[in-house]
Curated annotation (Swiss-Prot):
Residues annotated as binding NADP(+): G127, A128, G129, G130, A131, N151, R152, T153, V154, D155, K156, I219, G242
Any single Pfam family the record assigns to this protein: Shikimate_DH
Gene transcribed to yield this protein: aroE
Keywords noted in UniProt: Amino-acid biosynthesis, Aromatic amino acid biosynthesis, NADP, Oxidoreductase
Family annotation (HAMAP family): Shikimate_DH_AroE
Binding residues for shikimate: S15, L16, S17, T62, N87, D102, Y221
Organism encoding this protein: Bacillus cereus (strain AH820)
Family: Belongs to the shikimate dehydrogenase family.
Name of the protein in question: Shikimate dehydrogenase (NADP(+))
Length: 277
C-alpha cells in the first residue's frame, strides 16, 4: 500500500516540500506520496487526529503550527521540547512523535561547508526569534562551546541564552556591538527576516571587517544572495544561503520517516531550479 506523507500549514501553496520529497521517493523507487495539506489554526486538532486516523506515516509542520502542534502529539523529542517547536512528526507504533529538524538540519548544512569541526568555532548568531532558538540549541547540542547572540532587543538575546541548559559560553550583544566585533568570529549566522524579498536593501549587520576564512550563513533564500551575503562575499568570506538549511532539514525528516538517506545534492539542485536559479 502506498505510504502517505505530507506537510501542514497555512498558507501552504508555496511549499517546495512536496516536489522535493516526491522526487526523492521516485528516485529511490519507493511507493509513497507527499501531499501539502492546508490546515487553518482553528481546526489543527481535528486535522492531526484525521491524519493519524488515515494512517499517515509522517508529516512536516510549518507556519503557523510549529508550537501549537505540540499539544496534539503523543511524545516530543527532548531537543524539540527545549526548542519549543516541532516541524517533523513521525507516526510510529500508533504514536505521533514530534521532532525539530530545523536546527539539526542547519547544523548539518553548516558543517557541509566548513573544513573544520564546528565545535572549534566561535559563532555569532544574529536574531533571537524561533529560527535562532532552534539553531542555538542544536549547535549547543552538537557540542559547540562559543555562541554569542546579537539582537536589536538585547534582553531577548539574554532570554534565549538563559533558556539553554547545555554548557555554552555565550554573550548577548546589541547589533551595534556585534558590528564592531564581527572580526572576532569564525562563523556569522543571520536568522532574522531582514533582507528578505521585497526589502532586499536591508541588513541587520554591516559587514566591513571579517577575518580571513569567515563563514557567513543566511537562512533566507529569497533572494539567493541577501545584502549581508553580498557584502561578506566582497570581503572574501565563504557564504551560504537558506537553501541548504531547507534541504538538510527535509532530508533529515525523510531519513527519520523512511530509514533511507536521500540524495542531498539532487534535492538541492531541484529546489534551486524550482526557485528559478
Amino acid at each position: 500500500m502506498k505510504q502517505l506523507y505530507g506537510v501542514i500549514g497555512n498558507p501552504i501553496g508555496h511549499s517546495l516540500s512536496p516536489v522535493m520529497h516526491n522526487d526523492a521517493f521516485e528516485h529511490l523507487n519507493m511507493d509513497a506520496h507527499y501531499h501539502a495539506f492546508l490546515v487553518k489554526e482553528e481546526v489543527l486538532g481535528e486535522a492531526v487526529r484525521g491524519l493519524k486516523a488515515l494512517g499517515i506515516s509522517g508529516f512536516n509542520v510549518t507556519t503557523p503550527h510549529k508550537v501549537a502542534i505540540m499539544d496534539y502529539l503523543d511524545e516530543i523529542d527532548p531537543l524539540a521540547k527545549q526548542i519549543g517547536a516541532v516541524n517533523t512528526v513521525v507516526h510510529k507504533d500508533g504514536k505521533l512523535i514530534g521532532y525539530n529538524t530545523d536546527g539539526i538540519g542547519f547544523v548539518r548544512a553548516l558543517q557541509s561547508i566548513s573544513s573544520e569541526p564546528l565545535q572549534e568555532k566561535r559563532i555569532l548568531l544574529l536574531g533571537a526569534g524561533g529560527a535562532s532558538r532552534a539553531i542555538y540549541f542544536s549547535l549547543a547540542d552538537a557540542g559547540v562551546k562559543e555562541i554569542d547572540v546579537a539582537n536589536r532587543t538585547v534582553d531577548k538575546a539574554k532570554e534565549l541564552i538563559a533558556a539553554c541548559t547545555a554548557t555554552v559560553h555565550s554573550v548577548a550583544l546589541s547589533l551595534e556591538k556585534a558590528t564592531k566585533e564581527q572580526g572576532n568570529y569564525d562563523i556569522i549566522i543571520q536568522t532574522t527576516t531582514i533582507g528578505m524579498h521585497p526589502r532586499v536593501e536591508h541588513t541587520p549587520l554591516q559587514i566591513s571587517s571579517l577575518k580571513k576564512g569567515t563563514i557567513v550563513s543566511d537562512i533566507i533564500y529569497n533572494p539567493f544572495e541577501t545584502k549581508i551575503l553580498c557584502e561578506a562575499k566582497e570581503q572574501g568570506a565563504i557564504i551560504q544561503n537558506g537553501i541548504d538549511m531547507f534541504v538538510y532539514q527535509g532530508a533529515l525528516a525523510f531519513e527519520m520517516w523512511t530509514g533511507c538517506v536521500p540524495n542531498i545534492e539532487r534535492m538541492k539542485q531541484l529546489v534551486i531550479r524550482k526557485l528559478g536559479g
